[in-house]
């Protein structure tokens, strides 16, 4: 037999899973409803992803080596002093990154289907296949032609509003809303953001997250995020970041407006039967930073590697217990990272006073090094005891001063 796997969702998660599966000789189908989709996304990727996922230089629009943190009272702190010459945060456009990864998987033998999966039939017997009902958009006009596909395993990589998650009753999660405008700036204004990204904090831009100005290929992404309880305020919060960054954005032209949900924690069930969720569908976005691209691709790769290993390169059908090995490995490897970022968000995004403290803390070289090393290489990097004591003292001092600094 040859194992058949359907991967639903053609973003970084889905394509990364498909690539691993097809290399192992597994019959792999990759569904993407919109092949030219420009998904709303800040577009930041860590340095480790470039090498780990073998991304070519042209995928990266900008190499950010400087970050400016801006407090509620508009105190600016420049960070990035600890970066080495060859270290940077990559900024990319999702339509470019997604297209590259999907095409690479297709060239290896993945069957890419331009289609929308509407329904997943769950088999009554463990030995029976899953049936996907989908609209094939390559034929049948705008609505597509309804078709079915039977497979042994399904990977749900179809984002925060995952239909696959609903089909397996994976449970819900709390989420944030991100709103972003792509703005094309005059040449002199764009030059300011050549290697620079900005993060703004304050109640005026987000009561529980942050706002950003990230450089792209020929424009900047200007956006903000907040928890779903505040989603009615999202346009007012966007106006807040536009006001805070107004002088730097003068003469800019809005070329695209985007919004999307950001999961705030993993779903209660990420594997049910022979269906596994990865990326945003599973809830792998980090708190504090809201980063999702790397963890989406990494979770999908780990899931696919588990399928390859437990199926003996596609010679047997893996069980639910087999697929759950991926979850155990994931939680063991990254659980500490998620915990630390959750604590940071709870402590420092609460009030303008704590946000002032957060920005002040970011001026410390030891804090910068710890933060960038953890972000660039996706590990919680332990500091030596003396440095840790210094950071702890700095944190307490900044929190105490925060009330005085807040506007």
UniProtKB/Swiss-Prot annotation:
Catalytic activity: phytyl diphosphate + 3 NADP(+) = geranylgeranyl diphosphate + 3 NADPH + 3 H(+)
Protein task: Catalyzes the stepwise hydrogenation of geranylgeraniol to phytol during chlorophyll A (ChlA) biosynthesis.
Top-rank taxon, per record: Bacteria
GO molecular function: FAD binding; geranylgeranyl diphosphate reductase activity; geranylgeranyl reductase activity; monooxygenase activity
Catalytic class of the enzyme: oxidoreductase
Family: Belongs to the geranylgeranyl reductase family. ChlP subfamily.
The keyword Hydrolase appears for this protein: no
EC number annotated for this UniProt entry: 1.3.1.83
Keyword entries, A-Z: Chlorophyll biosynthesis, NADP, Oxidoreductase, Photosynthesis
GO terms for biological process, alphabetical: chlorophyll biosynthetic process; photosynthesis
Signal sequence residues: none
Pathway: Porphyrin-containing compound metabolism; chlorophyll biosynthesis
Lineage: Bacteria, Bacillati, Cyanobacteriota, Cyanophyceae, Synechococcales
Protein name per Swiss-Prot or TrEMBL: Geranylgeranyl diphosphate reductase
Keyword flag Oxidoreductase: yes
InterPro entries: BchP_ChlP_pln/prok (IPR010253), FAD-bd (IPR002938), FAD/NAD-bd_sf (IPR036188), Geranylgeranyl_Rdtase_fam (IPR011777), Geranylgeranyl_Rdtase_pln/cyn (IPR011774), Geranylgeranyl_reductase (IPR050407)
Organism: Synechocystis sp. (strain ATCC 27184 / PCC 6803 / Kazusa)
């Amino acid at each position: 037999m040859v194992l058949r796997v359907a991967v639903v969702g053609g973003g970084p998660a889905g394509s990364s899973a498909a690539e691993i599966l097809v290399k192992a000789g597994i019959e792999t189908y990759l569904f993407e409803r919109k092949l030219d989709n420009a998904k709303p996304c800040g577009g930041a990727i860590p340095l480790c992803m470039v090498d780990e996922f073998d991304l070519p230089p042209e995928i990266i629009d900008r190499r950010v080596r400087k970050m400016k943190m801006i407090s509620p009272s508009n105190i600016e702190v420049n960070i990035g002093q600890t970066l080495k010459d060859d270290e940077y945060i990559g900024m990319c456009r999702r339509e470019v990154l997604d297209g590259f990864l999907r095409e690479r998987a297709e060239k290896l033998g993945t069957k890419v289907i331009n289609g929308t999966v509407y329904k997943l039939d769950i088999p009554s017997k463990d030995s029976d296949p899953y049936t996907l009902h989908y609209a094939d958009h390559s034929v049948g006009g705008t609505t597509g032609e309804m078709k079915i596909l039977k497979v042994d395993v399904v990977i749900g990589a179809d984002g925060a509003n995952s239909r696959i998650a609903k089909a397996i009753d994976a449970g819900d999660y709390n989420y944030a809303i991100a709103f972003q405008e792509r703005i094309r700036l005059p040449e002199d204004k764009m030059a300011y953001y050549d290697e620079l990204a900005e993060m703004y904090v304050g109640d005026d831009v987000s009561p529980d997250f942050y706002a950003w100005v990230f450089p792209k290929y020929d424009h900047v992404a200007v956006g903000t995020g907040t928890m779903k309880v505040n989603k009615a305020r999202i346009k007012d919060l966007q106006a807040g970041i536009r006001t805070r960054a107004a002088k730097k954005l003068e003469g800019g032209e809005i070329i695209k407006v985007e919004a999307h949900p950001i999961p705030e924690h993993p779903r209660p069930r990420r594997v049910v039967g022979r269906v596994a969720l990865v990326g945003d569908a599973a809830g792998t976005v980090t708190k504090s930073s809201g980063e999702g691209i790397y963890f989406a691709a990494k979770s999908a790769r780990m899931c696919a590697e588990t399928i390859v290993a437990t199926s003996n390169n596609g010679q047997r059908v893996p069980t639910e217990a087999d697929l759950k090995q991926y979850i155990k490995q994931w939680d063991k490897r990254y659980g500490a990272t998620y915990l630390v970022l959750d604590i940071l968000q709870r402590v420092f995004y609460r009030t303008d006073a704590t946000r002032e403290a957060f920005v002040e803390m970011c001026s410390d070289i030891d804090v910068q090094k710890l933060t960038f090393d953890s972000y660039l290489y996706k590990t919680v990097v332990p500091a030596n005891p003396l440095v840790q004591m210094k950071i702890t003292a700095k944190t307490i001092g900044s929190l105490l001063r925060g009330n005085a600094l807040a506007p």
